Amino acid sequence: RLRRQRQMCIRDSHKGEKKSAAEVIMTQLHAGGKFDHNSYKVSGGLHGVGVSVVNALSEKLELEINRDGKKYFIEFKNGESKSPLKVIGKSKNSGTQITFLPSKEIFSSIKFNPNILIKRMRELAFLNKGIKILLVDDSQKKEKTSEFKYDGGVLEFVEFLDEKREKLQNKNGNDLFKKAVYIEGNKNNIELECALKWNAGYSEDIFPYTNNIHQKDGGTHLLLSLIHI
């Protein structure tokens, strides 16, 4: 509608989902943040399907949200909500907790592999310097806690990957590269961090990550990074 004083008014007839945002995200595909530069500055994902797929493949999933002094709760069974999101108490905390049980009807094994989780948590801690990640395994008789925190970020990541490899030395036996080379920059809203180090090996190992997702086959992101470097 065009109004006086050069104003324009736009109104749609969107019916709304008639359910909480939490339930929409957990039960509908493509409900993610897409390409928002703030939401996806460091997080992975693209099509908004991740957590809704986890829910769909779970026999049971519980979602707890601590926000604005309240604790919210909603429970799902086989991907469907058992009841709407509700307030179950007060909370001084902030954040979200998801507890899920994979479906035995879909997966041949629903046992989690701690070694895979440890490797992934370590990667995330390296890629997000300063963040602390705790992995607590109480599935066994004796509880085991692994803590990951690396203030050096990708620079420390390269040192970790290189620590057991043969060093490149001169004829006097001195290491030629005691520290990894570190490069960082920002161009056109794209941030780049790079660390590299030479050793005595004859082939390179490249570990490219985009928004914390390992791209083992390289691709455009790696190519553009090498061009800018």
Language-model features: locations:
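Short, well-ordered strand-loop elements centered on a beta-strand within folded domains, enriched
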Residues: 4, 73-74, 81-86, 203-211
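Short basic (Lys/Arg) and small-residue
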Residues: 25
